[in-house]
């Protein structure tokens, strides 16, 4: 049996977003999942916003995505561990993903893979973000407000959720340009390493997030910051080889080594 040395990372697929070709995007994502060699793969990390709007009721989950869940469960049945980080669009998962066999993780999550220390997450809300966004994020994560939202009929609730998404920057197809050291996430990474150094721990080797919808590969002191692109116009994921210690970015079938 081949050694399980492959670790895959993907984010911001935004399944269900009514921009571009939603059915084609879902088909591309299913094809990606089916292309993962299960016998040689250790884990798949879903770094948030896989769904454009996901909200679970106690006894009801959103319809659709049957082939996506089928492909994910096939991987898990074959021994691949699947980890899910809630993003700002699919934060409202209350047990269905775990019922399927996924493990839910919260950012920032530090783990060692193949001798390298990773810090993982979706990337939203990390660092000194503006007050308005902190308030919005607090609303999304507030248990009382979530309980209130659950009293709405799903037709109305999903109409609100999908309408909010269409009015967002993503719905308008605005492209974000990452501003390097001036970004809150960059400052978070630098501060995170400072805290680790102060406590006698080594710095992180690789910070890996999504959320910003632009591919980034930047040094942060002794570390490397990698951001995944979204799936709106192309397919983008990263593959880490735990034996060789290398990580490659895969984009629409062709790969660019980044480490």
Please name every model-derived segment.
Residues 123-191:
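Active-site-proximal loop/helix segment associated with metal-binding centers of metalloenzymes
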Residues 20, 129-132, 257-259:
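A short, polar/proline- and glycine-enriched secondary-structure boundary/capping micro-motif
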Residues 3-6, 252-259:
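A structural signal for the main folded, soluble domain(s) of proteins
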Residues 14, 89, 111, 127, ...:
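Residue-level detector of flexible, active-site-proximal loop/helix-junction positions
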Residues 38-39, 52-75, 168-204:
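N-terminal short leaders/motifs
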Residues 17, 54, 92-93, 127, ...:
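Hydrophobic positions within alpha-helical membrane elements
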